């Protein structure tokens, strides 16, 4: 009898109740917009960043403008640059924003069946702009942004915060991510993770992911519930 009770308890603890979504490059095709906004802001301040540099520094490593300036020995004002970039990015969202393939259908499929959280390292205004533009804010019980935690990805803080606010154990969650920094963060948080690479992240190291899928269209309830 005790063995049956223990087995039932372990099944419940491991049951997937909650899905934690990344935003940029996973649900929304916004990495190109972030890149364009940084390029325009830096150009206006007499500097330049290539697409490849942006992909490596921001998307892969999760570093920010302050580190980028410091590494190059520049004397630019990171606060002014970030403000310029933010204004331009929000402008671009109004005209260029689009969802990633399969994103809206997946959210609709999971909405009434799992608890959903959004965990994005971006600033709140950028997150709110994307959610409003795509009309998807109502899908999420919990939204955690980069200003809500001490350290952003690849640190695990943002996923741990999302799980805690959902009232779920790490073993009951699955993270959906498109970038190496997010995969590392999920791994450090002890949460299973499915990687869905995009154009900017196909060359990333996804060896820590529980599974790799080519598109959000491959994510199903059956896949989530049977993920080992």
Model-derived features: positions:
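Substrate-recognition element of Asp-dependent hydrolases with the DxDx(T/V) motif
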Residues: 103-131, 186
